[in-house]
A protein has these predicted regions:
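Active-site-adjacent structural elements that line small-molecule/cofactor binding pockets in enzymes
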Residues: 1-213
């Protein structure tokens, strides 16, 4: 899922995410977006035109809290010094997957993301967005090859493999296969078989002790 970052308190959100990362054994990823429904922002008292800038600044503020012993950040929307936030995630960061279909989202993924998730788009649109991600990452001094591209596959089962191969050529590494009214019958048996198989081999992981996390 995608969390609408500019609607949250970044200091509290940073602590929540770091805690989830610890409890999950570093399996937690934070999916972020800027939001699309202006009425939500009006109800929360968050200025709609500022949502992109807020998201960028909140990402930077959270990175400071995750990586610095006594964090300091001074921005337009967030300002703190000597802030202590515990626990801190392994490696000083929580993986961030940026959702969106715009150039702004792609640039954000290049600057802050470990992943980029445009849920849909034509081949031409996806190719353009992935190029924007790589260019933005390079400009930010980051490795563009370390950013994983994800998208959805809406095709029926018989067409899925062909579509996956096409997307792989575009630069997609991870796929979410959507089951909807158009392909539910074709996908149900396969999904059920995989769930039965998973049930037979799954072992509950439990929760690690704090000093082991």
């Amino acid at each position: 899922g995608i969390l609408i970052v500019p609607q949250r308190n970044p200091v509290i959100l940073a602590k929540e995410c770091a805690t989830l990362a610890k409890l999950s054994g570093d399996r937690f990823e934070l999916g972020i977006g800027v939001g699309w429904l202006e009425e939500e922002f009006n109800a929360l008292g968050v200025p709609w035109p500022d949502r992109g800038r807020r998201t960028d600044e909140y990402c930077e503020a959270m990175q400071a809290l995750w990586s610095q012993d006594k964090a300091e950040y001074h921005g337009r929307y967030v300002d703190f010094a000597n802030a202590i936030s515990r626990p801190q995630p392994t490696g000083g960061s929580v993986p961030i997957v940026v959702g969106g279909h715009s150039d702004a989202a792609a640039k954000r993924a290049g600057r802050y993301g470990t992943g980029f998730f445009p849920a849909k788009g034509s081949d031409e649109e996806l190719t353009h967005l992935f190029e924007v991600v790589r260019r933005s990452a390079t400009e930010a001094g980051r490795n563009p090859d370390a950013i994983e591209n994800t998208t959805m596959v809406w095709s029926p089962r018989r067409e899925s493999l062909d579509r996956v191969k096409q997307l792989e050529d575009l630069g997609v590494q991870t796929y979410l296969h959507v089951i909807d009214a158009a392909n539910a019958d074709a996908m149900f048996d396969t999904a059920l078989q995989q769930l039965v198989k998973l049930q037979s081999i799954a072992v509950p992981a439990g929760f690690p002790a704090y000093d082991e996390a």
